[in-house]
Design a protein with these regions (language model features):
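Short catalytic-loop micro-motif centered on adjacent basic/acidic residues
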Residues: 24, 49, 78, 195-196
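Short coil/turn segments at secondary-structure boundaries
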Residues: 27-31, 193
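A short glycine/small-residue-enriched secondary-structure motif
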Residues: 7-13, 37, 41-42, 64-69
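N-terminal glycine-rich phosphate/adenylate-binding segment common to multiple enzyme folds
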Residues: 32-63
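Mixed-charge interfacial surface used for oligomerization/domain docking
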Residues: 1-5, 19, 55-77, 83-234
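N-terminal glycine-rich anion-binding loop in soluble enzyme alpha/beta folds
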Residues: 1-27
Length: 234
């Protein structure tokens, strides 16, 4: 199914919690991209396609394949976000702002590249269960981690890969550490948009946002729920 089209996020996460086996995920086929690209080209419009990191998914390659089949190739650009989920969403928001301000495809791509170089994504997981089910860690590692109440803290590196950063004992310490990392790695937070993503823990996300505002007073804070593609594996 397509995320949010045939199954709501709440329904998806309810099914995921009860599942013994993880659902599988797949990138959109080139035909889906091609249809949208053709519609934009037929309307005389330029299009910028922003995809999940090519290091995490074949979506970028799928979009490039679609572009290659398009007669009006120069009207479309495919941009590798080198991130995922709400980090990718931030780039989409920035691209939309620029398009509405009248910037063209080339100008938008130039600015997106600058924004991408400054983008920073860090997160923690409450359980190792889904990493184990997805084959990313062994069952023994997952069991030991849960027994010791280990919460991994991960980040998306500049190549667009999810890599371990550190570990914390207990969720409270992990959340506190996230706030510290934002201060350590964030630049000019008073002038930045910070997006907080969560998976079925909206109240905690709101509390985190409140603490973030109190400590660092960023320009803007938004909260969103993580979609099924990333949620499946985390």
């Amino acid at each position: 199914f397509r995320d949010c089209f045939k199954l709501s996020r709440d329904d998806f996460y309810s099914l995921l919690t009860a599942a013994n086996k993880l659902p599988t995920t797949a990138q959109p086929p080139p035909g889906d991209f091609l249809q949208v690209m053709q519609e934009a080209a037929a309307a005389g419009q330029e299009a910028v396609v922003i995809t999940i990191s090519s290091a995490l998914s074949g979506t970028y390659e799928s979009a490039l394949m679609a572009q290659d089949q398009l007669d009006q190739k120069d009207q479309v650009a495919v941009f590798d976000s080198r991130t995922a989920s709400l980090g990718e969403g931030l780039l989409v928001l920035k691209a939309q702002e620029m398009a509405e301000a009248g910037l063209g495809k080339s100008e938008i791509l130039k600015e997106l590249t600058k924004i991408r170089s400054r983008l920073f994504s860090v997160f923690t997981l409450d359980t190792l269960e889904y990493l184990q089910k997805g084959g990313r860690i062994s069952k023994a590692q997952a069991v030991m981690g849960d027994v010791l109440n280990i919460k991994p803290i991960l980040e998306v590196n500049k190549e667009g890969r999810i890599v371990p950063r550190e570990k914390a004992r207990g969720r409270r310490r992990a959340i506190k550490r996230l706030l510290d990392i934002i201060a350590e790695d964030g630049r000019e937070l008073y002038n930045q948009l910070v997006i907080i993503g969560h998976s079925r823990c909206a109240e905690e996300a709101i509390a985190f946002a409140d603490e973030l505002k109190k400590l660092y007073n960023p320009k803007e804070v938004q909260i969103g729920e993580i979609g099924s593609t990333i949620g499946t594996h985390t």
